[in-house]
């Protein structure tokens, strides 16, 4: 197993056990430079409670969570009874949707896997502002600001979260330490499995706020964790995006970094 290299700065960003200190690894910047991308990658190793990033300043800067918010939204839906259980089917009303893969009946896992925005907008509407606000405070999720509409505050409203806060939230979920039932946390964790390789298991979720412009770019996310043998690695990546053709980079850049660290891949 390779170790994180070229750590040059230590900064206290949080009081939590996982991200109490984070180190800057400038060697990762070559992956961003190669694609002419502005972004950040935070990678934390559970056993050593150590974290690294290519950009200390951006690691703590908050952005729209976009569809990464489906993770807490699903837990809140289960906790409030809006989602009955993991077997509940969300019926398609037959009306055209932005993506063809959303135009069908979906289970919770299916809705997460295809990132079905209409399903989670309906969940949020049924949860309502009061309960939504209560749970975001319980979860210490981002700036906890749900202004901008109950069914879009995470897409174009005022909710913001940093890459560091993302990994903190994911660690709490992994350890079943969120203020939610263990059963509901397990349901969502299972729904987040995106890769099951012989040597490792990836739980993850992407997010995309839209492309924006060159002067005011959107944000693209990939967050999650990797279980490998007895180790767990939590990660959060975000990048500025002004052209949809760059969207695959939200996964390819962090994948290359994790491959170079010996976490995933061959």
Curated annotation (Swiss-Prot):
Residues 1-19 form the signal peptide. Gene3D superfamilies: DD-peptidase/beta-lactamase superfamily. It is an enzyme of class 3 (hydrolase). It comes from the Bacteria. Changing residue 70 to A: Abolishes catalytic activity. It is found in: Periplasm. Activated, with respect to most beta-lactam substrates, in the presence of 0.05 M sodium bicarbonate. Its EC number is 3.5.2.6. This is Beta-lactamase OXA-10. The keyword Disulfide bond applies. It holds the Pfam family Transpeptidase. InterPro entries: Bact_Transpept/Beta-Lactamase, Beta-lactam/transpept-like, Beta-lactam_class-D_AS, PCN-bd_Tpept. A beta-lactam binds at residues 115, 206, 208, 250. One of its GO terms (molecular function) is beta-lactamase activity. Class D beta-lactamase which confers resistance to the beta-lactam antibiotics, including penicillin, carbenicillin and oxacillin, and also some cephalosporins. Confers weak resistance to some carbapenems, in E.coli strain C600Z1. Acts via hydrolysis of the beta-lactam ring. Has penicillin- and cephalosporin-hydrolyzing activities. Keywords: Antibiotic resistance, Disulfide bond, Hydrolase, Periplasm, Plasmid, Signal, Transposable element. Belongs to the class-D beta-lactamase family. Disulfide bonds join 44-51. One of its GO terms (biological process) is response to antibiotic. Dimer. Optimum pH is between 6 and 7. It comes from Pseudomonas aeruginosa. The modification N6-carboxylysine is found at residue 70. It catalyses: a beta-lactam + H2O = a substituted beta-amino acid. The keyword Disulfide bond applies.
